[in-house]
Amino acid sequence: MRAWIFFLLCLAGKALAAPQEALPDETEVIEDVTTEEPVGANPVQVEVGEFEEPTEDVEEIVAENPCQNHHCKHGKVCEVDDNNSPMCVCQDPSSCPATSGVFEKVCGTDNKTYDSSCHFFATKCTLEGTKKGHKLHLDYIGPCKFIPPCLDTELTEFPLRMRDWLKNVLITLYERDEDNNLLTEKQKLKVKKIHENEKRLEAGDHTVELLARDFEKNYNMYIFPVHWQFGQLDQHPIDGYLSHTELAPLRAPLIPMEHCTTRFFEACDLDNDKYIALEEWASCFGIKEKDIDKDLVI
């Protein structure tokens, strides 16, 4: 996989911004994307009028904003009802920040290009409870374009590149960590063994034949990276399963560059329940059943 793909996805894999879209029966608790500032960064300031003949000092009164700690999912914003209680309501797409470039556009599964993820989720919110809204998901980052079909031969090559990429992402994070807290101490200990292994295949645009041989030869190096990525995605909620929402931070940047992404993740869902369990995930990447260990998801 090319280096520029690697560095783009390295950031996406770690940031794990909030999940893109929640499936039915899923509770998604994330910050509103309409602003980069934390919700309720500044409490509402209540102005005090001036009196012509004040008899005592008038102190400024700071009222608590009910929305300060009330988080809404993508597409919704917090408002206060008549009882001064916070509630989440659909955001008006026209209130989304103006976009400045093509890279902010996103493509929905309806094959429609939206100006930004904010516009997409605000639109989707208005469709809640409808068949169209249930089927609508954020497909990938960037304007909609033709995605060629994934051939069977290409599908078998995809996990080879993905495994190598996951390993290299961890190594890069380890090398850049120092005081950045990119990895936990437990994760560092695992990656250190990979980093110090002289037999490790260096990052590069390798042939699928070389990647296949390296996986067979250095199989143990790939066990932890596969578990690690699962743990990075399994966040909302942390339940041992990956939903469409949780996969989005990984798949959305990948699809325009790796056209087998969608088919690969669909194939991983062996029981077609719309969720990918750890066992299904690890199996997709060629990890043997005896080496699948939930304790490695750290």
UniProtKB/Swiss-Prot annotation:
Q: What are the residue boundaries of the Follistatin-like domain, all occurrences included?
A: 66-88
Annotated EF-hand domain residues: 256-291
UniProt keyword terms in alphabetical order: Basement membrane, Calcium, Copper, Disulfide bond, Extracellular matrix, Glycoprotein, Metal-binding, Secreted, Signal
Task: Name the CDD domains for this protein.
Answer: EFh_SPARC_SPARC, FSL_SPARC
Give the chief site where it resides.
secreted
Q: Which PROSITE patterns match?
A: EF_HAND_1, KAZAL_2, OSTEONECTIN_1, OSTEONECTIN_2
Task: Tell me the disulfide pairings in this chain.
Answer: 67-78, 72-88, 90-125, 96-118, 107-144, 150-260, 268-284
Sorted alphabetically, which InterPro entries does this protein's record hold? Answer: EF-hand-dom_pair, EF_Hand_1_Ca_BS, Fol_N, Follistatin/Osteonectin_EGF, Kazal_dom, Kazal_dom_sf, Osteonectin_CS, SPARC/Testican_Ca-bd-dom
- Residue numbers binding Ca(2+): 269, 271, 273, 275, 280
In Gene Ontology terms, what is a biological process of this protein?
negative regulation of endothelial cell proliferation
Establish whether keyword Secreted is in the entry.
yes
Pfam families, alphabetized = FOLN, Kazal_1, SPARC_Ca_bdg
Positions of glycan attachment: 111
Signal sequence region: 1-17
Q: Where is the Kazal-like domain?
A: 84-146
Q: Which GO terms describe its cellular component?
A: basement membrane; cell surface; extracellular space; nuclear matrix; platelet alpha granule membrane
Which molecular-function annotations from GO does this UniProt entry contain? calcium ion binding; collagen binding; extracellular matrix binding
The subcellular localization recorded is: Secreted, Extracellular space, Extracellular matrix, Basement membrane
Classification via PANTHER family: SPARC, SPARC OSTEONECTIN
* Function noted in UniProt: Appears to regulate cell growth through interactions with the extracellular matrix and cytokines. Binds calcium and copper, several types of collagen, albumin, thrombospondin, PDGF and cell membranes. There are two calcium binding sites; an acidic domain that binds 5 to 8 Ca(2+) with a low affinity and an EF-hand loop that binds a Ca(2+) ion with a high affinity.
* Protein family: Belongs to the SPARC family.
Protein name per Swiss-Prot or TrEMBL: SPARC
Q: Which organism is it from?
A: Coturnix japonica (Japanese quail)
Ranked from the top, the taxonomy reads: Eukaryota, Metazoa, Chordata, Craniata, Vertebrata
